[in-house]
Amino acid sequence: YSNSEDSAGGGTPFHSYNVKSISASSSLKEEQYGQDVVYAPINLFRAFEIGCRCHPYWWNYSHIPWVEGAKGYGINETISVEFKNQIYGFSILNGYADIQNMKLFKENSRVKKLKVEDLTNKLEYTMNFEDKVYFNYLELSKPSKSIKLTILEVYKGTKYQDTCISALIENTRA
């Protein structure tokens, strides 16, 4: 995905104005109700919609997460993001977060440990996640324009091996 194309449809994602490009080592593709569904990495930036002045954004109820498409639990699967403007940190909403179908969080696998590589500054971080729905924030020690996320460990899903991440929200202010 590059910001000049919107291959997954559905209009402009709320947070993607700063995304120059995004890619993943794999993405799950499946058929639902006769339609092909791709759980692409750009979905990380589609969790919220633009709102009004009093409520600047709200949850996008038609949002689907990024889901790795490798065999097994997705260990060592990656997401790479290049930003137009530097970021100072970011938040991740782990797992399959769906307000209308909350059982999907436990049914699918979730990240337990994530390696974060700051490709701009050649720095490395580790993010550890609790097994619950929340935003986990990582503050970068230096501003960056390029990051790579690698799944190191997962919480296994009760029904599916597929590992999911629902959202990534970058912090563009120091």
Language-model features, listed with the residues they occupy:
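A short, local hydrophobic-aromatic micro-motif
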Residues: 20, 88-89, 112, 166
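Trp- and acidic/polar-enriched beta-sheet ligand-binding modules for extracellular glycan
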Residues: 25-28, 73-76, 96-174
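Disordered, acidic Ser/Thr/Pro-rich linker "stalks" and the adjacent N-terminal cap
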Residues: 1-78, 82, 174
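Residue-identity detector for glutamine
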Residues: 32-35, 86, 100, 161
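Generic detector of short alpha-helix boundary/capping microenvironments
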Residues: 83-86, 156
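Mid-length scaffold segments of soluble, non-membrane domains
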Residues: 87-95, 99
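Hydrophobic beta-strand segments within beta-rich accessory/binding domains
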Residues: 80-81, 89-90, 149
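Phenylalanine-focused residue identity feature
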Residues: 14, 45-48, 83, 90, ...
